[in-house]
């Protein structure tokens, strides 16, 4: 295989060379796709840059990121985090990415503005039992809890699923949101073949979660 550049008007000439069997255009340069998240999720339509557009940026709303420890310091989160329970947990950076997608302000680069740039972000260390969610919801008005962690294949509708469903049922303003699709090559014993075991963790089987 030979890669080369040549003028478009020479394509016919090139194709007539006897030892050339096949000609194809090269792929376009790769582009990061995560920056299109706001438009894919339509959050750009409720928090627009237009003077007369909607400005719902989640100001006054509290959310929680259950992840791998302290987030930042970063100007995209300045003045909007509560991290007292992870103050000395400085090891991971997965939570920084998740928090940025959720509520980055786009101060450093507007292209990376998150879904809810005005939200107050409570940061906690992830635990599969999601402890104290109800307490945070009741005491600090935290509405959305985001957990982008998996803990192996599902074991069906477990006692943990029941616990989370019950908490949500009794506290209607509490919303649990989980990652999915990150284990798309797994079967997880479903019997449908590779690609079906893409939701990891017992709590993700609950009926009232997103």
Regions found by a protein language model. Give the residues of each.
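Glycine-rich, charge-decorated loop segments at or immediately adjacent to ligand/cofactor-binding or catalytic sites
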Residues: 182-205
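Subtilisin-like serine protease catalytic core
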Residues: 46-129, 140-143, 154-157, 169-175, ...
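Extracytoplasmic/secreted envelope proteins and their assembly/folding machinery
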Residues: 8-11, 17, 95, 99-102, ...
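Active-site neighborhood of phospho(di)ester-bond hydrolases with catalytic His/Asp-centered motifs
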Residues: 146-148, 176-181
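Alpha-helical scaffolding within the catalytic cores
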Residues: 127-135, 194-198
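Active-site glycine-centered loops adjacent to acidic/histidine catalytic or metal-binding residues
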Residues: 67, 164, 181
């Amino acid at each position: 295989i030979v890669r080369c550049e040549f003028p478009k008007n020479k394509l016919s000439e090139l194709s007539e060379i006897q030892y050339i069997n096949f000609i194809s255009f090269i792929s376009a340069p790769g582009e990061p796709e995560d920056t299109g998240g706001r438009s894919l999720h339509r959050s750009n339509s409720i928090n627009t840059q237009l003077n007369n557009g909607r400005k719902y940026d989640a100001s006054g709303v509290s959310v929680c990121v259950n992840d791998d420890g302290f987030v930042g310091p970063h100007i995209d989160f300045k003045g909007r985090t509560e991290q007292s329970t992870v103050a000395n947990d400085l090891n991971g950076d997965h939570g920084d990415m998740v928090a940025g997608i959720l509520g980055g302000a786009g101060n450093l680069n507007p292209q990376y503005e998150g879904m809810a740039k005005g939200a107050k972000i409570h940061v906690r260390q992830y635990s599969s039992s999601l402890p104290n969610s109800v307490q945070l919801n009741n005491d600090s008005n935290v509405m959305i809890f985001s957990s982008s962690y998996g803990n192996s294949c599902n074991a069906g509708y477990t006692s943990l699923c029941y616990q989370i469903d019950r908490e949500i049922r009794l506290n209607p303003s509490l919303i649990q949101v989980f990652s999915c699709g990150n284990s798309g090559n797994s079967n997880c014993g479903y019997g449908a073949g590779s690609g079906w075991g893409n939701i990891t963790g017992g709590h993700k089987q609950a009926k009232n979660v997103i």
